[in-house]
């Protein structure tokens, strides 16, 4: 059912799922752009547990869960010497020089970008054979990509590619989001009024649909990562230049928020928010 101007009070409480503690994102300024490939490598989460089950290669997300946590598994699933492109120049990494990389598992949230609502389900597509995980350094205008390919039923990391954000298919949206995520006044000016809203009843998980006035945005908005964000490309071509769907979720899948943006007359604006 539709509620106009005000969603029932219980919906407000449910937004807590989208609003955990505000986390401080690692400052990109402390990481030289050309050293990004080694900047996230630590052994904090690395383990030497037994080989994950074969089922871990079914979905990319299942594979990634183990890749980011298991040191032995990670090293086994990298094609060495690892191609490591930095602004087009290959600086290969030998197996002995590799440092365990937890990628985004240490983050309280990570983000994924799609060009429409339908493509959000691509993460569950078992036919996908090439996935690109990205770190997007908004403040420095840099992108680090991890290229994973599935060969003979197994996912492997084949290439790192660090380059200027200008080469990225989402460069226009990233430039917009850089300011949207940090400037409250800019946010308010780039939200359709009213905007669509959906949340779920915690008792029966029934959807609660409605619309909110832009003045209510500060009360409902999720904590949005800024400065440095992730993206996982499951094969999205981003051919729809007028729409982007940003999914903010936690590695544990304990929370998820979806923000839908549309571009009208060259200007991006938030049109819909969904909180799970």
Where are these regions (language model features)?
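Sec-dependent bacterial lipoprotein signal peptides
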Residues: 1-16
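Short, aromatic-enriched amphipathic alpha-helices that serve as compact interaction elements
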Residues: 55-73, 170-185
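Short, well-ordered alpha-helical segments enriched in acidic and aromatic residues
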Residues: 62-69, 73-99, 187-201
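Surface-exposed, charged secondary-structure patches
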Residues: 83-87, 92-142, 201, 206-255
């Amino acid at each position: 059912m539709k509620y106009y101007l005000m969603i029932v009070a219980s919906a407000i409480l449910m937004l807590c799922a989208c609003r955990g503690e505000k986390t401080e994102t690692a400052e990109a300024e402390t990481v030289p752009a050309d050293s990004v490939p080694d900047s996230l490598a630590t052994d904090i989460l690395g383990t030497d547990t037994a080989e994950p089950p074969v089922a871990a290669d079914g979905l990319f997300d299942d594979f990634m869960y183990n890749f980011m946590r298991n040191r032995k598994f990670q090293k086994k699933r990298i094609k060495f010497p690892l191609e490591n492109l930095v602004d087009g120049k290959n600086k290969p990494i030998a197996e002995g020089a590799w440092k365990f990389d937890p990628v985004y598992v240490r983050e309280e949230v990570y983000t994924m970008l799609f060009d429409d609502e339908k493509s959000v389900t691509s993460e569950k597509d078992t036919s996908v054979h090439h996935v690109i995980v990205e770190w997007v350094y908004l403040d420095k205008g840099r992108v680090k990509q991890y290229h994973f390919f599935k060969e003979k039923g197994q996912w492997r990391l084949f290439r790192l590619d660090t380059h200027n954000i200008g080469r990225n298919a989402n460069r226009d949206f990233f430039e917009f989001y850089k300011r949207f995520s940090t400037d409250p006044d800019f946010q308010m000016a780039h939200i359709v009024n009213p905007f669509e809203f959906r949340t779920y009843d915690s008792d029966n998980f029934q959807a609660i649909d409605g619309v909110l006035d832009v003045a209510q945005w500060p009360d409902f908005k999720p904590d949005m990562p800024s400065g440095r964000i992730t993206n996982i490309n499951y094969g999205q071509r981003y051919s729809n230049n007028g729409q982007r769907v940003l999914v903010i979720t936690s590695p544990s899948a304990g929370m998820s928020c979806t923000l839908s943006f549309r571009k009208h007359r060259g200007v991006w604006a938030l049109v819909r928010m969904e909180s799970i």
